Amino acid sequence: MKKQTQAIHLEYERRDAYDSLSVPVYNTLAYEFDNAAIMSEAFTDKIKAPDYSRVENPTVTNLERRVAALTDAAHATAFNSGMAAISNTLMSLAAQGKNIVTSKHLFGNTYTLLVATLRRFGVKVRLRDLTNIEAVREAIDDDTCCVFLEILTNPQLEVADLKAISEVAHEKNVPLVVDSTVIPFTQFSAKSLGVDIEVVSSSKYVSGGATSLGGLVIDYGTPYNGDFAKRLYGEMLFNFGAYMTPQVAYMQTIGLETLDARYRVQSSNALELAKKLRTLPQIQYVNYIGLEDNPYHELAQRQFGKTAGAMICIDLESKEACFNFLNNLKLIHRATNLFDNRSLAIHPASTIFGAFSENMRRSMDVKDTTIRLSIGLEDVDDLFEDIKQAVESL
């Protein structure tokens, strides 16, 4: 079956009393057992049965199994946010005295998790240019617990060579962990590129309508992962209590079924819009990996296929121009989410990176002159006209 068909049909078996066509929402905390022996076996994992919805729920399990089947993974685990997925993953791999090799180009909260929170627990962080394979090789040593990166950085839109990095990491028995939020896991094969663990903010493309918050950890079960699965599920999930709710899992299952169709339209819209934006003299630079002269275009196509996602960044003359541009928008929404059905715009330097110092933002290549656009399902002509009138009013 093709991915779109799999997303709709995989892993759901109608076993409820009414043969519901859609996955039911099991809005329950606890589950009754026929006798004490079976109850004991469930709690000690001798039999597979849900015992408490803080760690397992049939609605959530269906989403997890569907994601694992779609990605050819060993396991998928659903969390209540993308940051919960990232933090639980890294804490499952890291320990005092260990180090994580990563990039300076990270989502703001991921950056602070690494350089502030985990450092307080004795985990070292090595920030490197991950487009430089030799720099990655030199950074990895016997205490490296993982290499972590975003497959398309936000808002720099930088692409690293996953296959090359995975080969370097695997030479030293180190797993490669990637955040694939900005390119859906249904659109490319992370496993074939050597990725060992994939984390996703399912609040974005999977949710689609910006109505549910969640995260996914996709474990490919490779030899480089060690006891990761045991730690993630048997320790982190149990002890930190960040499991996805059944209501969210139900909504995100519906989102998953339409993800491929939405993504194809959003990517097509983004490419057409990016080309049109180049005709506006007020825009100094259009950054989109779908454009043929983008420095990462060839690598992105090799890794992610012909579609390039729904995120475009544009550079204007100044920070003041960026603020005025946002204020001039009439159709596109000023909001911080990504990959909603609606198109969104934000000034990253003053919002998601606003708590960082100017020097820190500069070191992360977050510019005051950049606007990030998340392209939705609207007609491209309407989006272009809105941006056109916004920049012409500067």
Model-derived segments and their meaning:
Residues M1-N57, I371:
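N-terminal "arm"/small-domain region of PLP-dependent enzymes with the aminotransferase-like
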Residues V115, K124, R262, E320, ...:
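PLP-dependent enzyme catalytic core of the Aspartate aminotransferase-like
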Residues L271-K330, R334-R342, F356-R362:
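Conserved small-domain helix->loop->beta segment predominantly found in fold-type I
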Residues Y12-R14, N27-F33, K204, T258, ...:
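Glycine-rich beta-alpha junction loops
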Residues K48, A74, L213, V248, ...:
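Short amphipathic alpha-helical segments
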Residues M251-A261, G309-E317, R372-G376:
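Short, well-ordered beta-strand elements within core beta-sheets of diverse protein domains
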Residues A7-E13, H75-L280, N287:
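Conserved PLP-enzyme active-site core in the AAT-like
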Residues A30, N35-A84, N109-A116:
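Conserved N-terminal alpha-helix of the aminotransferase class I/II PLP-enzyme fold
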